[in-house]
Amino acid sequence: KGSRIGIVLNGSPMFTGDGGSGESEIRKWIIENDMLECIVSLPNSLFFNTGISTYIWILNNNKTEERQGKVQLINGSNFFNKLRKNLGDKSKEISKEGRNKIIDTYKQFKESDICYIFNNSHFGYTKVTVEQPLEKDGIAVTTKQGKVKPDTKKRDYERIPLSDDIEDYFEREV
């Protein structure tokens, strides 16, 4: 039948790690295998020892047909009540109404002012190295084999969304 799990994480797993790094490869595997169903942003200051923003990642290895190839993002960051007295860094709790609104939004799987739905390809990118030739007196420096040497001081990188064709991207952006 399949399994669905929810994991509470900070923001780092969403964006850390260059393409090919461990973090990036884990994220890539989850998305390529169509297991990321939803990410819910939570209010900050929900936990005792930190005020950081947190997120619930919902993973599902048996998505319904309408959810296949898609990721639902829900902004639940405004659904909280302030505590009368802070408990360490914890100064908020998710309100009952907020929990119900998040759950209903998740179940409905429709875009709204707090819900966005994207194709999986929206979340991946290819990291491309952009080189410029090393020049001496305005002439490109080459190796003994005749290859142009790159100027490492001018090296740059482009993060190209998987949904874009690399050649089209460079024509349009670089």
What label would you give each PLM region?
Residues 1-173:
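A conserved structural/catalytic subdomain of Rossmann-like adenosyl-cofactor enzymes
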